[in-house]
Amino acid sequence: MTAPLVKVLHRMQELFSNIVAALEAMIVFPSLFRDPSRKRRKTFHGAYWRRRTLDNFAEEVDRLFTSPLSLRNMIIMSEKIREQFKSCLQSSPVCMLPSYNHALPSGTEKGTYLALDVGGSTFRVALIELGGAGAMKILQESSSPIDNDVKLLEGTLFFDWMAEKIESMLSAVGADYGREAVPLSMGLSWSFPIEQTSISSGLVIHMGKGFLCSNGTLGQELGDLIVQSCRRRSLNVRVDAIVNDSSAALLSRAYVDPKTRMSLILGTGTNVAVHFPVREIGLTKFGTRPPGWFDYAKHVIINSELSMFGGGILPMTRWDDILNQTHLRPDYQPLEYMVTGRYLGEIVRLIITEAVETANLFRGELPHSMRDPYSFDTSIVAFLEADTSPSLVPSAALLQKEHTFPVSPSVEDLRFLRRICQIVSKRAAGYLATAIHSMWCLRNDAEFSDPTESKASSVKDTQEITIVESEEDSRSLSIACDGSVINKYPGFRDRCQGYLNQLTQQTNSSQGPLDPATSPYIRLELAPESAILGAAVAVAVAVEDQKSG
């Protein structure tokens, strides 16, 4: 069978699966597809509603979402996810990817650096001063929205726009700042895929998210494109480090907390970076490295792409199934679909839709605007969960501002919604903690195992990697946290920390008697401004590395 025919058949199979999923959704949630002008047949629905109350429905949701969160279940899930990590460490081209950042900051680095943070909607430029002893200061900064007009800039025009913003920010510092004979060191936090070729270089590939700047620049060196645009404005800058957001978070927190070995991004999406022994990683994962890189790189920061793990391990409910089956990329990011800001609101919306059909929520009338997928934002979920007022008046006001209700939601409706939001976010915190615990165990296994007994496929005839960690290390660590959900969702970080405490206690107790005061731990620590600060720290570390090399 020819390759094109196989592709056609595969696409037809995907199309058929999506049609089946849509039909299932029509059967389960007919209100999503009902003509709003059609008169409701109250007799039928009246009998249907009497099958269960809102309280009974909430109990079912609670059972389905929280029953996997027993300590025993979470330990088992953690062990299974660890096996997925181990497999991907050896050969996967899409996850557990080693970066070029092998050294962590000591906290003593000093200097003033230009830092850039290019995200999906904002471009930030800042001048950062590192003062040593973990002291970081933003001397000057600017933030520019990346609107649709900017996204449509093709080729070098986008980098020219960046250079204009860089020049504007530096001019606010001093007329000649950035124009001296000695190049100004610059770090870049780049939130898009690149084919990285060194700590300071990478080749442009398709960016997605509506950006067109890769048109005409594919395969060109990213740092050179930025530098050339800056030179056209007589700016003398040099790109010394390129990092992604999770690596930037780890580096920024490690500068002030020497126990930082992991980072967590949890906002619209999620990811984890971890400082990991080189010897435990498959050699093919490294691609082409500079000469001698393996001689001095004992560790490397891994981009785990955590969102892709947990498939077939983390239990799903019928609402998760509908979300997954109707997604453009079903099964692609199992963990992400159940824990992130992009999807928590949609899970709640799907539960609401069924509650309207079967438990008389909102008197059986689903607001028309809630019929659209992803129309129930996670910010509403967070607000509802945080509302402790007796009659939930603030929640009612927000709901009626965002959606049009034929009849105002009752207090019973609002209490049901708050409970559902609490249940959905509780599971998200538990599943995330399970994945983090799994990564912690994986790191401990690799870090404290006998390197002579390593079974990793890193050691090849063509390249021998026998790096042995000589520095004293600890199983206790801090995780740098950034992102709207982990930083701002009420109680989420505390709940996740509580699960981590239980999981680490269980792991510690299984290894024999330990002094509670010295037992290994995981601490979730906020890393504010991590993308921009981490870019500066990455430069400082790279500069120190060049000096020592």
Curated annotation (Swiss-Prot):
It catalyses: a D-hexose + ATP = a D-hexose 6-phosphate + ADP + H(+); D-fructose + ATP = D-fructose 6-phosphate + ADP + H(+); D-glucose + ATP = D-glucose 6-phosphate + ADP + H(+). Residues 106-243 are annotated as: Hexokinase small subdomain. GO terms for biological process: glucose 6-phosphate metabolic process; glucose metabolic process; glycolytic process; intracellular glucose homeostasis; mannose metabolic process. Residues 244-529 are annotated as: Hexokinase large subdomain. Keywords: ATP-binding, Glycolysis, Kinase, Nucleotide-binding, Repeat, Transferase. ATP binds at residue 110. Transmembrane segments: none annotated. Gene3D superfamilies: 3.30.420.40, 3.40.367.20. PROSITE patterns: HEXOKINASE_2 (PS51748). It holds the Pfam family Hexokinase_2. GO terms for cellular component: cytosol; mitochondrion. Pathway: Carbohydrate metabolism; hexose metabolism; Carbohydrate degradation; glycolysis; D-glyceraldehyde 3-phosphate and glycerone phosphate from D-glucose: step 1/4. Its EC number is 2.7.1.1. Residues 159-185 are annotated as: Glucose-binding. GO terms for molecular function: ATP binding; D-glucose binding; fructokinase activity; glucokinase activity; mannokinase activity. Belongs to the hexokinase family. Catalyzes the phosphorylation of hexose, such as D-glucose and D-fructose, to hexose 6-phosphate (D-glucose 6-phosphate and D-fructose 6-phosphate, respectively). Mediates the initial step of glycolysis by catalyzing phosphorylation of D-glucose to D-glucose 6-phosphate. This is Hexokinase-1. The lineage of its organism: Eukaryota, Fungi, Dikarya, Ascomycota, Pezizomycotina.
